[in-house]
Swiss-Prot record:
Name of the gene: hfq
Name of protein: RNA-binding protein Hfq
PANTHER family noted in UniProt: RNA-BINDING PROTEIN HFQ (PTHR34772:SF1)
Family: Belongs to the Hfq family.
Function statement: RNA chaperone that binds small regulatory RNA (sRNAs) and mRNAs to facilitate mRNA translational regulation in response to envelope stress, environmental stress and changes in metabolite concentrations. Also binds with high specificity to tRNAs.
Length: 79
């Protein structure tokens, strides 16, 4: 079986999407967004909060902070 390499951002976003972890996203212009990732692709992230969706382009994102620890890989301790 050929193992395909995954980008760290894809692993991170897919993990927080599956676990429905709330995120705080800071944009390069200083705007702070919060919500849950419902989908993402190479160029954007779909964020949902209070029944509203926001499409955020990745080039506008500065920092992503999860609301709780994220275990992205098997065997990773939560220390």
């Amino acid at each position: 079986m050929v193992e395909r390499s995954q980008h760290l951002q894809d692993v991170f976003l897919n993990t927080v999407r599956k676990q429905k972890i709330s995120l705080t996203i800071f944009l390069v212009n200083g705007v702070k967004l919060t919500g849950i990732v419902t989908s993402f692709d190479n160029f954007c992230v779909l964020l949902r909060r209070d029944g509203h969706a926001q499409l955020v382009y990745k080039h506008a994102i500065s920092t992503i902070m999860p609301g709780q620890p994220v275990q992205m890989f098997e065997g990773e301790s939560s220390e």
